[in-house]
Amino acid sequence: MNLLIKNVALLSMKEEQPLMENTNIYIEGDTITYIGEINPDIKVDRVIDGTKKIATPGLINAHTHLGMSLLRNYADDVPLFDWLSKHIWPVESKLSAEDVYWGSLLSMIEMIYSGTTTFCDMYFFMDEVAKATEEVGIRGVLTRGIIEESDAEINKEKLRDTRKLYNTWHNKADGRIKVMVGPHAPYTCSSSYLKEVVELAKELNTGIHIHVSETKKEVEESFQKHGKSPVKHLKDIGVFDVPTVAAHCVHVSDEDTEILKEMKVSPVYNPTSNAKLASGFAPVDQMLKKGINVALGTDGPASNNNLNMFEEIHFAATINKALNYDALAVPALEALKMATINGAKALLWDKEIGSIEVGKKADIVIIDIDKPHFYPHHNLISALAYTAQASDVDTVIINGKIIMENREIKTVDVEKVMYNVEKRAKNLIQR
């Protein structure tokens, strides 16, 4: 189908001209083919009126755990290690494949409602996440979470699972699914096991998605065990020799950030989750000023407790000003980059998504700015970073397909998903 979005303001995320006050976007199939004045020679099947709206690249949630929506509001006001060991991991051990399927569907619905078109997920039963991704029409990077166990055969099986996931789903669903390798963290995987993970990533020619330096305790224990920080440890054993999505990077030193820059690692900032779990705040402004590609994420819906990337953009842009006593820290456009083009770079997808440009995939969010909280329209970049709400998202296009229009999702029965999640979540806690 050929689409025209007409008379729309455009935040393209192109360096030379990020904002256009009024333009027209032509989409042919899954690709953006023309941006500019109305061209009567281009035939279209559908016209979307963009008057009093702004088109932006689809938001990219670069770190999350979608199936954890079943545990939203289940265990709150608890520090990370207690939260994991006493509350989350015991319940997760009872999860079924169907649980993860329905929980992931719910998370994808929530993301679409709030303008997210691409995610990077680490969980298990990833075939079910892939099926949900295919059905909903969203774009995703899937990583099977790998935690080393005492049984060597189980550990080998986890690597085989990842290889199978890659062979089954990588570049499938019209190219909307990619697969990376997902070791949970350096404190849950030994050096020798991580080296096996790296070899698998090299074999598959893909990246690694891992938690890094999320808490002070993790860093302290790394120094006790290895005599170095988690970042230095991961570099020394070769993890950063492949493209790495490093979730959190909260407690990182100047030496660590130099390593992240040198090895072209992409940290993912999860400010709300890090704040809620009292983990701290990553030195994002300093990393950005060093030229490090920092992406943005929500973390899981059980530790955030939502998947609203507009909240993350707003928080990322504001809290860093307070932390640094610097009103210029993480300006509005930089926060928006973290949620779009930086996320695309982190996920090795920036040649296709992350900005609205001719030749790129049509992952576009149309936001209604004809609302009281948007007026007056002095600066639309500031408005998107500091003012926009998830409920302002009107239309979502992914891979050239209209997934949501007038806030109605077209690909999945939302009521059915909510019903099944409520039923399964209550049952899960009682198992």
Swiss-Prot record:
Residues that hold substrate according to the record: 92, 144, 184, 214, 299
Name the reaction it catalyses.
S-adenosyl-L-homocysteine + H2O + H(+) = S-inosyl-L-homocysteine + NH4(+); S-methyl-5'-thioadenosine + H2O + H(+) = S-methyl-5'-thioinosine + NH4(+)
Q: Does the keyword Cytoplasm apply?
A: no
| Cofactor requirements of the protein | Zn(2+)
Name the PANTHER family on file.
Answer: AMIDOHYDROLASE-RELATED DOMAIN-CONTAINING PROTEIN, AMINOHYDROLASE SSNA-RELATED
Protein family membership = Belongs to the metallo-dependent hydrolases superfamily. MTA/SAH deaminase family.
Protein name as catalogued:
5-methylthioadenosine/S-adenosylhomocysteine deaminase
Query: Which source organism does the UniProt entry give?
Result: Thermoanaerobacter pseudethanolicus (strain ATCC 33223 / 39E) (Clostridium thermohydrosulfuricum)
Which lineage? Bacteria, Bacillati, Bacillota, Clostridia, Thermoanaerobacterales
